[in-house]
């Protein structure tokens, strides 16, 4: 019998320049490039992992944060299993825009039950000392808007990056019927005997 794992689509949303591409690349490749250009449209990377005994393939989508790329990114929202709303702790405007990003996602992803959809909030760039958004402010927003989990991350030094993505998987596992996500893997039981062909008249 072929082994099965789950395929989860996870999308990163937030203003341009908050570090979405860097977070994805740090998590998947464990590399950080300070010279990354802004994403145009969308791109994605896959990562296989095991979370709490569940084998998962994460399909992580990075989206362009600039307004002029809205028509390019929004068609890819559909089918998402979790949304990582991302802001930069050194940019208060990116924090204030979280509500707009949430609304945009719910609308274009056609989320049927927004109150139960798994969002995870990331306050990125904690390696920068000059903060404009406090931990308390971010936690209060999360509590008021759906009691979402909040992680302060740094793609530069990898702080909490893995923990945030793994929490996204746990949120999906807690809310979704995994049978909708099952995919075949390459593991096959070589000792299984084939069933005899049956026929009927």
Curated annotation (Swiss-Prot):
Record keywords, A-Z: Acetylation, Cell membrane, Cytoplasmic vesicle, Endoplasmic reticulum, Endosome, Golgi apparatus, GTP-binding, Hydrolase, Lipoprotein, Magnesium, Membrane, Metal-binding, Nucleotide-binding, Phosphoprotein, Prenylation, Protein transport, Transport
Membrane-topology annotation of the record: Lipid-anchor
Catalytic activity: GTP + H2O = GDP + phosphate + H(+)
Binding positions for Mg(2+) per the UniProt entry: 21, 39, 62
Compartment(s): Cell membrane; Endoplasmic reticulum membrane; Golgi apparatus membrane; Late endosome
Record GO cellular component, one term: plasma membrane
Cofactor (UniProt): Mg(2+)
Phosphothreonine sites (modified residues): 187
Residues covalently joined to lipid (S-geranylgeranyl cysteine): 200-201
Activity regulation statement: Regulated by guanine nucleotide exchange factors (GEFs) which promote the exchange of bound GDP for free GTP. Regulated by GTPase activating proteins (GAPs) which increase the GTP hydrolysis activity. Inhibited by GDP dissociation inhibitors (GDIs).
UniProt xrefs under InterPro entries: P-loop_NTPase (IPR027417), Rab9 (IPR041824), Small_GTP-bd (IPR005225), Small_GTPase (IPR001806)
Renumbered ranges of motif Switch 2: 64-78
Binding site for GTP: 17-22, 34, 38-39, 65, 124-125, 127, 156
Motif Switch 1, chain ranges: 31-42
Enzyme class per UniProt: hydrolase
EC id: 3.6.5.2
Biological processes, Gene Ontology terms: positive regulation of exocytosis; protein transport; Rab protein signal transduction; receptor-mediated endocytosis; regulation of protein localization; retrograde transport, endosome to Golgi
GO molecular function: G protein activity; GDP binding; GTP binding; GTPase activity; identical protein binding
Modified residues (N-acetylalanine): 2
Pfam families: Ras (PF00071)
Complexes and interactors: Interacts (preferentially in its GTP-bound form) with GCC2 (via its GRIP domain). Interacts (GTP-bound form) with SGSM1; the GDP-bound form has much lower affinity for SGSM1. Interacts with SGSM2. The GTP-bound form but not the GDP-bound form interacts with HPS4 and the BLOC-3 complex (heterodimer of HPS1 and HPS4) but does not interact with HPS1 alone. Interacts (GTP-bound form) with NDE1; two RAB9A-GTP molecules lie on the opposite sides of the NDE1 homodimer; the interaction leads to RAB9A-dynein motor tethering. Interacts (GTP-bound form) with NDEL1.
Function, as annotated: The small GTPases Rab are key regulators of intracellular membrane trafficking, from the formation of transport vesicles to their fusion with membranes. Rabs cycle between an inactive GDP-bound form and an active GTP-bound form that is able to recruit to membranes different sets of downstream effectors directly responsible for vesicle formation, movement, tethering and fusion. RAB9A is involved in the transport of proteins between the endosomes and the trans-Golgi network (TGN).
Family of this protein: Belongs to the small GTPase superfamily. Rab family.
Annotated protein name in UniProt: Ras-related protein Rab-9A
Record organism: Rattus norvegicus
Gene (name only): Rab9a
């Amino acid at each position: 019998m072929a082994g099965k794992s789950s395929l989860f689509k996870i999308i990163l949303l937030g203003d341009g320049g908050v570090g979405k591409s860097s977070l994805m690349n740090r998590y998947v490749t464990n590399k950080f490039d300070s010279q990354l250009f802004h994403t145009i449209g969308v791109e994605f990377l896959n990562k296989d992992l095991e979370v709490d005994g569940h084998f998962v393939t994460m399909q992580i989508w990075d989206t362009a944060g600039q307004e002029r790329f809205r028509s390019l990114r929004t068609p890819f929202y559909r089918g998402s299993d979790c949304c990582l709303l991302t802001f930069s702790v050194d940019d208060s405007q990116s924090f204030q825009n979280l509500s707009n990003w949430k609304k945009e996602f719910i609308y274009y992803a056609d989320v049927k039950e927004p109150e139960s959809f798994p969002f995870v909030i990331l306050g990125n760039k904690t390696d920068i000392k000059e903060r404009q958004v406090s931990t308390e402010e971010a936690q209060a927003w999360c509590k008021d808007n759906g009691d979402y989990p909040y992680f302060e991350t740094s793609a530069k030094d990898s702080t909490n990056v893995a923990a945030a993505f793994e929490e996204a998987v746990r949120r999906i596992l807690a809310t979704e019927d995994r049978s909708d996500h099952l995919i075949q893997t390459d593991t096959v039981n070589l000792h299984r005997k084939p069933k005899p062909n049956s026929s009927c008249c």
